[in-house]
UniProtKB/Swiss-Prot annotation:
It comes from Arabidopsis thaliana. GO terms for cellular component: mitochondrial inner membrane; mitochondrion. It is a single-pass type II membrane protein. It is found in: Mitochondrion inner membrane. This is Prohibitin-5, mitochondrial.
Length: 249
């Protein structure tokens, strides 16, 4: 029984510590935090160094490194007495401008509006560099990558969009085929109706006319092909009015 009480006390103490830790976060030296509020969006005022409180689930801090970073550049140059010298320059910079601009766009916009993001970064950096008599020729984003989970989500979204477009194409094709079948059936029905009406009006005269036209075609074929023999199935050797016939080469 004492051991059970000790376990309960330990679990309760651990839960209390976890609850307290979930309401606090720490910003180290050389860092700043941007607070995202689930209902209000990104708060304008950045959070400085130290330990701060947050509302679990409602607030989430994003911590950025603002320390000055070195960047080395190797270049060749000529001296006054025409001697070539190789120089290694160290440029100290802070990525404040890049982070400030990127924070204005969401992840999808960075992909679709990359030229606009580059232009905004370039404009801001050129304006800032002029204060120190530095001329920047160009600034552009040459690489952009996300975390594995977001990349997989983007890939799944693209696959879903492709499947949706494919489904639309299949549905449209089926609809066109259905319409074509309806039009073809309507045409055949209309043709049958016209033939039936003509036959009813002309009687056997129309049928005899068709037979005469068929016999004329056979005669033309025989005249153009002396090696072809016409073999009627019935007793009429000229027009084969009373039965089927065939042409044998």
């Amino acid at each position: 029984m004492p051991w059970s009480k000790f376990t309960k006390v330990a679990l309760g103490l651990g839960a209390a510590i976890a609850a307290v830790r979930s309401t606090m976060f720490t910003v180290d030296g050389g860092q700043r935090a941007v607070m995202f509020h689930r209902f209000e969006g990104i708060l304008e005022e950045p959070v400085g160094e130290g330990t701060h409180r947050k509302i679990p689930w409602v607030q989430k801090p994003y911590i950025f490194d603002i320390r000055t970073k070195p960047y080395k550049i190797n270049t060749d140059s000529g001296t006054k007495d025409l001697q070539m010298v190789n120089l290694t320059l160290r440029v100290m910079f802070r990525p404040d401008v890049v982070k400030a601009v990127v924070a204005q766009f969401n992840a999808d916009e960075l992909l679709t509006e990359r030229p606009q993001v580059s232009a905004l970064i370039r404009e801001t950096l050129i304006k800032r560099a002029k204060e120190f008599n530095i001329v920047l020729d160009d600034v552009s984003i040459t690489g952009l990558s996300y975390g594995k989970e977001f990349s997989l989500a983007v890939e799944r979204k693209q696959v879903a969009q492709q499947e949706a477009e494919r489904s639309k194409f299949v549905v449209a094709k089926a609809d066109q085929e259905r319409r074509a079948a309806v039009i073809r059936a309507e045409g055949e029905s209309e043709a049958a109706r016209v033939i039936s009406k003509a036959t009813a009006g002309a009687g056997m005269g129309l049928i005899k006319l068709r037979r005469v036209e068929a016999a004329r075609e056979v005669a033309i074929t025989l005249s153009n092909s002396p090696n072809v023999v016409y073999l009627p199935s019935g007793g009429n050797m000229l027009f084969a009015m009373n039965g089927p016939s065939k042409v044998v080469a």
